[in-house]
Amino acid sequence: MAPPTGVLSSLLLLVTIAGCARKQCSEGRTYSNAVISPNLETTRIMRVSHTFPVVDCTAACCDLSSCDLAWWFEGRCYLVSCPHKENCEPKKMGPIRSYLTFVLRPVQRPAQLLDYGDMMLNRGSPSGIWGDSPEDIRKDLTFLGKDWGLEEMSEYSDDYRELEKDLLQPSGKQEPRGSAEYTDWGLLPGSEGAFNSSVGDSPAVPAETQQDPELHYLNESASTPAPKLPERSVLLPLPTTPSSGEVLEKEKASQLQEQSSNSSGKEVLMPSHSLPPASLELSSVTVEKSPVLTVTPGSTEHSIPTPPTSAAPSESTPSELPISPTTAPRTVKELTVSAGDNLIITLPDNEVELKAFVAPAPPVETTYNYEWNLISHPTDYQGEIKQGHKQTLNLSQLSVGLYVFKVTVSSENAFGEGFVNVTVKPARRVNLPPVAVVSPQLQELTLPLTSALIDGSQSTDDTEIVSYHWEEINGPFIEEKTSVDSPVLRLSNLDPGNYSFRLTVTDSDGATNSTTAALIVNNAVDYPPVANAGPNHTITLPQNSITLNGNQSSDDHQIVLYEWSLGPGSEGKHVVMQGVQTPYLHLSAMQEGDYTFQLKVTDSSRQQSTAVVTVIVQPENNRPPVAVAGPDKELIFPVESATLDGSSSSDDHGIVFYHWEHVRGPSAVEMENIDKAIATVTGLQVGTYHFRLTVKDQQGLSSTSTLTVAVKKENNSPPRARAGGRHVLVLPNNSITLDGSRSTDDQRIVSYLWIRDGQSPAAGDVIDGSDHSVALQLTNLVEGVYTFHLRVTDSQGASDTDTATVEVQPDPRKSGLVELTLQVGVGQLTEQRKDTLVRQLAVLLNVLDSDIKVQKIRAHSDLSTVIVFYVQSRPPFKVLKAAEVARNLHMRLSKEKADFLLFKVLRVDTAGCLLKCSGHGHCDPLTKRCICSHLWMENLIQRYIWDGESNCEWSIFYVTVLAFTLIVLTGGFTWLCICCCKRQKRTKIRKKTKYTILDNMDEQERMELRPKYGIKHRSTEHNSSLMVSESEFDSDQDTIFSREKMERGNPKVSMNGSIRNGASFSYCSKDR
């Protein structure tokens, strides 16, 4: 059985020859947006694999003798043979891309060609060799077989006809309807031209690789169809019958494989675009193994081609075209492969199924081979294609990105491939609304403060906040409301009242969130004073005087007047009052009884307040004294003397008598000052002594106390000093306490002495004389290493020394410390004002309040205060550079209003001098400027033109050399300019020449003396006059040029002049 490709080519050749021999094939009526419902058992339909325009599809049907209808549907061409008219009745559908074009043919066909064509058509499958199987047609046209209702059939509207005209471009003439030579299919209006039936199938070659000029018509564009189509000749492969043997040989098969690597063999049915042929000439040739027939356009009236069934050779006439007896190559049929439309899925959906669709369907008892390949995929995709040799490919666990798949379908004589893209998009993000945050949520101000800040920059969102909007909910009307659409709300000129503000933030997705902030502005209230006369007092005679204190009275502004007076019930009592209009009232000469005193205070607003205090004077009540001889003593022999101290004894009225006496002991002692509070005992020996103290008051009441003195004889061990070892202190912490309490002694340590080492820094203060106590307290230490020696001494005079070391390390935040000098006394800067100032600085520097750390506040002068602080960034915490913070703060302060901060800023600078001075000097910590080393100086350009930073970049030696060089160059250049000017002036001074007109001159002399370039002297009156010059610089006597001298000097000139101009003449000054 012959291959289908060869049979189809033979069929196309026959119908081409038949079409050339018979009358013209004409285009009939065209229906747009219409389909047919044929009986697939009796109606033959063939699908053309390539995509053609409508006009080319019609031409292909005209070239096939048994084709009655060209059906162009969705970009594909179908050739239909209609044995029954009702099978090809157009039915209108919706707006689809479908066009039905009927072809008109003569009723009578040549018998010999018809018999041969029927023989070829009836060979093979029952539905015709050129028709596809009904199953393939149903797969390709899924709507066939449906029962279309009558309501779907309607007349065509004007827009359908306009579309039809745009696609087909019909001419203006119309073929008369009802001709006997055509069937009764409707004629297309204006279808005047006919179609040439001299085209068959030819292997298609890609446009970029075609070289054969006879096959160049395959590349012609079909975008502009014309009613008349050009003629061309084609090469058609003829089929071989079973009797002719094998068509393809092994060497031809190898050639086909080599050619298929450059261009895939395709079997296509191409329509002809030719004018109505006048004749068709066909040369008779001998067809051997695989002949190729060349059909040349010619006259169909004189030549009828013979079917290529004869194998007998024949001689060719001069008019016949030679046919190359080459063997027809084996052709590979191109398959139309589609993997479906490009897919787009969105996570979490990560599975997809791909299926390959192939047209035409595989022949009976054969199948196609499928191969799926992944051409491109995201970098993070690690999967592999499994079961990639099936028609359906299942994919799972796809990640985000673009996947490009290629499916290759092949069989023994067919090949095709298709591509499909799978795009996996990330899961849709769920937008979270923003969170509006205001800081602080509640503020309270008291006049005269009338400005406030509310910060909304701490609001957060999962993407981005694009807008802030502030609005006042309630409160007094604000005349000046600024920055309502910025993160920070600045309010000024506030009136007393309660304010509420709403902040609304909007993110990039349009979600909003709101929160409120409250602000309370209080009036400057003048509260009345509060009088405080102090607590009640009780005194006992004979004490009859006391002082009352009213300085605890208070007022929010100032108390201007104090008034003391006797209270109710005490008006007639005797008392001496002093300082009745001062805070302190001195009372004296009081008698037994109760006194009531009233204090009235008046403030600056004349508001008053009163308070009452009671003084009770009790009668005299004597109590016995209390004798205190002191703690018991323990002494070490030998003892020169011992002191007995009874000064701690007490009495309510006073002790008037002291007496010491020796009660018992191992030996007699000598006592001095036995009638005084402090007595001295000598002559003590080893043992225990008891002494008694007796005291008496004025009323004779007495009291006694006993003191024990133990005298021991022991060996004394020296004490052990413990100063505390080594300590490390990190600035700004500059205070420390050295503890020597761990020093020990067998008896008792009686003295401690801390001595600073001579090599230690002198800076640093000792608090409260603690260098003589057990603990040494130090403050105001500076960077360096301090050494202190602790000397301890016991009661026997033995001593010991130990050393303590304090290493003060520099502040790690030194490079970030900024000094802010404010015009305010250090005593007036309260804690509340400091917190407000920190919030204002945070707004200026665009940081949080907690990011600003105040390290030190100290007085700069009586009217100024220095605040030392640093700024740390958000986690991870890092201290910002002081130079950047100072520069940023200075820039922001210059842009804001003068009263933005609570106090006027006098200076902003770094706390330490951080300049490196280019390695040729050091930085002055007071002036914050570089002090250059010897032979170095500042870079004046950088200092005064660029960034203004102090430095020591210039060497004085090089600057001096450069300055000297510049002076020399400047002087040389000046001297050169002076010389050039003098030379130019010298060249300009020339001899002035006077000219006199000479009239008697010939034409040659005039030409010789004529000025160059036609320049005329301003003293001449004629163009051709001759001038005689006189010099003013030679002498005072004029030099006269005469014609006689010229003639004597040059005889030739004289001769020639006399011949041309006549006799010579003399010209001198008298002739002028």
From Swiss-Prot:
Residues 254-265, 1053-1072 have a biased composition (Polar residues). Keywords: Cell membrane, Developmental protein, Endosome, Glycoprotein, Membrane, Neurogenesis, Repeat, Signal, Transmembrane, Transmembrane helix. Glycans are attached at residues 196, 219, 262, 394, 421, 498, 513, 536, 551, 733. Its main location: membrane. Detected in adult brain cortex and fetal frontal lobe (at protein level). Highly expressed in brain cortex, putamen, amygdala, hippocampus and cerebellum. A motif (Endocytosis signal) lies at residues 995-998. GO terms for cellular component: clathrin-coated endocytic vesicle membrane; cytoplasmic vesicle; early endosome; early endosome membrane; intracellular membrane-bounded organelle; plasma membrane. Residues 21-955 are extracellular. It is found in: Cell membrane; Early endosome membrane. Residues 341-427, 435-524, 530-620, 621-714, 720-811 form the PKD domain. It is a single-pass type I membrane protein. Residues 168-277, 295-327, 1045-1072 are annotated as: Disordered. The chain crosses the membrane at residues 956-976. It holds the Pfam family KIAA0319_N. The keyword Transport does not apply. N-glycosylated. O-glycosylated. Residues 311-320 have a biased composition (Low complexity). The keyword Metal-binding does not apply. GO terms for biological process: central nervous system neuron development; multicellular organismal response to stress; negative regulation of axon extension; negative regulation of axon extension involved in regeneration; negative regulation of dendrite development; neuron migration; positive regulation of SMAD protein signal transduction; sensory perception of sound. Residues 21-99 form the MANSC domain. Residues 977-1072 are cytoplasmic. It is linked to Dyslexia 2: A relatively common, complex cognitive disorder characterized by an impairment of reading performance despite adequate motivational, educational and intellectual opportunities. It is a multifactorial trait, with evidence for familial clustering and heritability. Homodimer. Interacts with AP2M1; required for clathrin-mediated endocytosis. This is Dyslexia-associated protein KIAA0319.
